[in-house]
Design a protein with these regions (language model features):
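Signature of N6-adenine DNA methyltransferases within the class I
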Residues: 16, 21-249
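Short, solvent-exposed loop/turn segments at the edges of secondary structure
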Residues: 1-2, 152-156, 272
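Conserved SAM/SAH-binding beta-strand->alpha-helix loop
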Residues: 12
Length: 283
């Protein structure tokens, strides 16, 4: 399998060379030439110039990068041409799901670990619709609230889909602690959002919805949070805040405490020690 059935693409040339070396070390045998990998493990931007044919793989496995949509402005026109899941606010990983679907043979399997933001985000609606109409969900592990990657700020999920139209199927939902699981009907999911809950909890939700008024039906204007255009410049930690204020006390007038989505809990908030340089309302 390692010699004849494994293919890979990475945009980072060093990662490609390391992968080749690892495969050579695993398959090398005395007196035999090393396996040729130049046409199997390749360096390319797979979203824009995939070197392998569509409908040709039994399994696609990946850890798509979590790159915010603000950082991919230069390739958005190309993404819009190539992907039906394109929206102007979609983060980069969304397109890898559609690419995987295109690469798979019928009945092929896709396994990803990446951001779970598309479960609920508005920009994920087209992708959710594609999954519900064209794929069979096999297994979901939703890690909401549990840190999987130290350097990742977004919550993650493991998703296993099959390129097969759904047919009254059920799938496995594994708890984020990985110590329990339950079955769920794919038909219980909607393209408006993916909510993975056990049937008894889902029934309670339905009762509450019938008796109450949904937030979207209230006379409220709800918008996204602060859009800085460059978070790394405008969002700072405690040390940087103190540094700026020590240089000029007037800086304290434009540095405000910041609550991000991850800081908001069920019944309150936990301040994460981050601040916003708020020049917008301070001419």
């Amino acid at each position: 399998i390692l010699e004849h059935n494994l293919y890979g693409v990475d945009i980072n040339e060093d990662a490609v060379e390391i992968a080749k070396l690892s495969l050579w070390l695993r398959t090398a045998k005395r007196g035999r030439a090393l396996t040729k990998l130049a046409d199997k493990i390749v360096c390319a931007n797979s979203l824009l110039e995939m070197p392998f044919s569509e409908n040709s793989f039994d399994v696609v496995i990946g850890n798509p990068p979590y790159v915010r949509q603000e950082a991919i402005k230069d390739i958005k026109p190309q993404l819009q041409e190539k992907y039906i899941t394109y929206t102007s606010t979609s983060d980069l990983y969304v397109y890898f799901y559609e690419l995987s679907y295109k690469l798979l043979k019928q009945n092929g399997l896709n396994g990803f670990i990446c951001s779970n933001k598309f479960f609920r985000a508005k920009y994920g609606e087209v992708l959710r619709d594609l999954i519900l109409s064209e794929m069979t969900i096999n297994k979901i592990v939703d890690f909401t609230g549990r840190k999987v990657f130290e350097d990742a700020t977004a919550d993650s999920a493991i998703t296993i889909f099959q390129k097969l139209k759904p047919n009254n199927n059920t799938f496995i939902v594994v708890s984020k602690e990985l110590n329990s699981s339950y079955l769920m009907k794919q038909s219980d999911l909607t393209k408006s959002h993916f909510a993975f809950t056990e049937s008894n909890i889902r029934n309670i939700h339905l009762k509450i919805e019938k008796k109450g008024t949904k937030l979207k039906e209230w006379n409220l204007l709800i918008n996204r949070g602060i859009l800085t255009g460059f978070n790394e410049a405008f969002m700072i930690d405690e040390d940087k805040k103190n540094e700026f204020i020590s240089k000029d006390i007037k800086n304290s007038e434009i540095i405000k405490p910041l609550l991000r989505g991850r800081d908001i809990k069920k019944y309150g908030y936990e301040f994460g020690g981050m601040y916003l340089i708020n020049t917008h309302n301070n001419p």
